[in-house]
């Protein structure tokens, strides 16, 4: 499959950088061919917000057949390890939705053809490299697009806060059963 066959709406630079969520957020997500979707995200009834979209996975680029030195090969291997990206469309009045993790805002920029800026966040857990981008759609400002890049390597902090009292109770009760 040629790079240009992946999606005609993306420029070659966007495809090479796996930047499917550049300034074309609304257009690209709405016009991507079905082959780039790897599955459905089912909303949970226990969730406080319901995603209205899908899991997007950009296919890896084909290897190039040029002669590269050792450092070039290492860089190419590092670039070929793609971090998973997941995008959710959510109808909400709030810009930042509570997903159970703690985030630190590290940037914001205005985007062409959109009155709403894009905000950039990092997970605050010390060993976690997950990032997220939050932006409203230009065509429908009631929809927030949240794009996650990476996978958390720790439990959800809010879930643990909720479960800690229950776990303490279980430990307390199990200490009686051991007597």
Curated annotation (Swiss-Prot):
Primary subcellular site in the record, as a coarse category: nucleus
Lineage top rank: taxon: Eukaryota
Keyword Transcription: yes
GO annotations of cellular component type: nucleus
Location of the protein in the cell: Nucleus
Annotated keywords: DNA-binding, Nucleus, Transcription, Transcription regulation
SMART domains associated with the record: WRKY
GO molecular function: DNA-binding transcription factor activity; sequence-specific DNA binding
Range of residues in the leader sequence: none
Start-end of DNA-binding region: 92-157
Reported function: Transcription factor. Interacts specifically with the W box (5'-(T)TGAC[CT]-3'), a frequently occurring elicitor-responsive cis-acting element.
Family as reported in the entry's similarity comment: Belongs to the WRKY group II-c family.
Name assigned to this protein: Probable WRKY transcription factor 24
Source organism of this protein record: Arabidopsis thaliana
Recorded name of the encoding gene: WRKY24
